Regions:
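Conserved metal-binding segment of the jelly-roll/cupin
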Residues: 186-201
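Active-site lining segments that contact anionic ligands and/or coordinate catalytic metals
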Residues: 182, 189, 210-214
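Non-heme Fe(II)/2-oxoglutarate
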Residues: 2-11, 46, 55-58, 65, ...
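Catalytic core of non-heme Fe(II) oxygenases with the double-stranded beta-helix
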Residues: 118-186, 224-233
Length: 251
């Protein structure tokens, strides 16, 4: 089974994205989808994340990396069935195919929770080098388990920056500073921000102290390395409950 066949089996086709959404990906490097997850789905994910965090504590995210001031979870698909619905978000799958335009697979799955008074990130990209426009390798997403508000650590994005062929650290004096063209993404829980990994973005300071749990589910070119090699961590439980289409995309 190839990627296109897998997407067809999951109900994704050329009409999944509207012309306006495709234009947003082309011009801005991101789109916002509201109601990407049902309330009962993200409520279960919040509960499961918190339960796993009680066990993993400061080690949470160890499979990829840990972060002071932002509790993390990595390898979530192997740890809980509640996160499976993320693999069914059709606009995300369609966007990955639209941007990458060839065979792709899951790159990584992480959850990040910016703690009160923490969470500020440098503006960055999620790909390790600058690329020419069109030479894209990763599509990332922010799946909001809590609302993004102006003061709880919402993401800032620089629209159109994926077309620059540059990385923020190469042109900004300090990527922690505000960028003159950045916008703050505010949206209700269940929303999904889909972004080209070369679009400049970063988390902001959680001033209010409200919860700000967000899933990062990314897809990469099939021949590129995964953030977490799925076959090294694949459990029998995940293998048994995944359809052939899902297994194809998990690689």
């Amino acid at each position: 089974m190839n990627t296109k066949q897998a997407l067809n089996n999951l109900g994704v086709n050329e009409d999944t994205l509207s012309p306006e959404q495709k234009q947003g990906l082309d011009q801005d490097g991101f789109i916002l989808i509201e109601e990407g997850l049902a309330p009962e789905a993200y409520a279960k994910m919040c509960h499961r994340f918190d339960k796993i965090q009680e066990v993993e504590g400061e080690k949470g995210g160890w499979e990829v990396h840990t972060e002071a001031g932002a509790p993390r979870l990595s390898n979530g698909l192997n740890k809980a069935t509640e996160f499976d619905d993320c693999l069914e978000i059709r606009p995300l799958l369609a966007s990955a195919y639209y941007i990458l335009a060839t065979e792709f697979k899951v790159h990584g799955f992480n959850i990040r929770d910016a703690s009160p008074g923490r969470g500020q990130q440098r503006i960055h990209t999620d790909y390790g080098r600058a690329v020419e426009a069109g030479d894209y390798h990763i599509v990332n997403s922010l799946i909001l388990l809590d609302p993004f508000t102006p003061d709880n650590g919402a993401a800032r994005i620089v629209p159109g920056s994926h077309l620059s062929g540059q990385r923020p650290e190469d042109v900004m004096d300090d990527p922690l500073d505000p960028h003159p063209d950045e916008i703050l993404i505010t949206a209700p829980a269940g929303s999904v921000v889909i972004l080209n990994a070369n679009t400049w973005h970063g988390g902001t300071l959680n001033v209010s102290g409200e919860r700000r749990r967000v899933i990062h589910l990314s897809y990469c070119l099939r021949d590129d390395p995964q953030q977490l090699v799925q076959q090294d961590f694949l459990t029998e439980g995940l293998y048994q409950r995944m359809s052939p289409a899902h297994l194809c995309l998990l690689d």
